[in-house]
Amino acid sequence: YGNNTVLSDVSLSVKPGEIHALLGENGAGKSTLMNILFGMPVIHSTGGFGGTIEFNGTPVNIENPHKAMELGIGMVHQEFMLIPGFTVAENVKLGREISSQTVASSIFGKSLERLDKPAMAEDTRVALNTIGLGVEDYARVAGMPVGYMQFIEIAREIDKTGIKLLIFDEPTAVLTESEAERLLE
């Protein structure tokens, strides 16, 4: 960050199926490392970083979150990225909506397709079942307990296809003890 070195001599190797945890005090650089791996703009706007990132044995330049997602990297952020007025399914499928063709879209293009809400709900239910969250896919996120919102964030990442590395930034910070235990199972 600016002229301050936040991380130095960091080396991390993760193999498929492994789970790793970074431990350290507040300000130790855990979130900074995760932001580097996900190409978050804050890294580049505060001076960038030196070094290399290898993914699947190949050096990569993760310049933004879109590039990270193309590589198969997903991230559950410390701050919620949900839209309160949307349903659970709309949040889980945001940016990856399933649509179906209409008469108008067949003439004027894809932008006039209709959301296939049953298909979106079905995908969402699979992700919610995977993490054991018994919330309705059509429920609005606004007003839900923060633990539910954290699990919805996780469901969104699980629902993505091609995920090879899933990064969690303090996933249990807002969870109750029983919710944290369920997540870690």
Describe every region a protein language model picked out.
Residues Y1-E185:
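Glycine-rich phosphate-binding loops of nucleotide-dependent enzymes
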